[in-house]
Amino acid sequence: MSVSHPAHLTVLDVQDVGPHLRRLVLGDGDVARGFDALAARWSGWADSYVKLVFLADGVTYPDPLDLDEVRASLPSDVWPVLRTYTVRRLDLEARELWVDVVLHGDEGVAGPWAAQVRPGATIHVRGPGGAYAPDPAADHHLLVGDESALPAIAATLETLPAGARATVFCEVDGPDDELDVHTVADVDLRWLHRGEAAAGTTTLLDDAVRAWSWPEGRVQAFVHGESRLLKTVRPYVRERVARGDLSVSAYWRLGATEEGFRRWKAEQRAVEPG
């Protein structure tokens, strides 16, 4: 199945894994049974992502859904809205896709939907894509991010072998937002609490990384979260990590919709290639 044909999946379970984080367990149901199509594209990247596809009410779309056909035949104001989320886990044996959604009240499209969705609902899912996996040969792994990067950070820690060393800086609202992460690696996990400050407005991650005692040997770094990380943490880490050992990207931008965020990323690529 081509990428223009998203997989049609069923919400199997909904779990609140934190006060602001809801896990959607997706798979095959009675009506939507697209897991095999999704799994066929799976490459196992730790930062694998999918796009949840939200259809406009009252519009007749091609069945099966073909996004290329939609864009060619329907006006742009009824094109589906796509929202990107990192895959927390894809379990081929259990035939489940886990997607963790940060809840922001009534803001946006995906958050309000995730806040009220119940098992049995269906959703189209495009992807997965991805590009990062931890190299077991690295001497140390540095993982930096906020809630949006937490699924990828957790997936990375789960794949690290015994004896691997990692340091994690993760910014969340407070202690209740800290998650249990299972790993056999030697991990120093440091939670940074922003308190009443809004996400994307603090210097907690930048300050923590700059105060960190850089270890000897080869360091592989993963730096993802709100766009300010590109201007603060990225330059500092780039001076210390080989280009091929650095995965750095913004997952979101304060005050921007995903459409606006995509435009901003395109502008950044134009002025700073690579």
Each model region followed by its residue ranges:
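Extended, composition-driven regions rather than compact fold-specific motifs
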Residues: 1-274
